[in-house]
């Protein structure tokens, strides 16, 4: 919840972020690679105060919102960025152009030919 209040790394081209359901605590092993800037996936910083005097979200302004109401709101958590592609973005763009359709429980965006990442390394 502290990360929600402060914001975090941004979902911009080439970053890796944790996939999850609507429950912000559900991120486990799936991730996605941002192939465009997706700032709407970033955590929404919560200004100081209780109540929060002025809060803006999705082009709307809210006033005097109880802090606990904001900190416990799943919509504000965003998707946690934990890495970045530093080499091989051309491969990611090829993956992006793979034809997709429905698959398993998903109605769309599933590659028609499975994509396998054979190698990835951590650079500190």
Regions inferred by a protein language model and the residue ranges of each:
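Cross-family detector of peptidyl-prolyl cis-trans isomerase
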Residues: 1-124
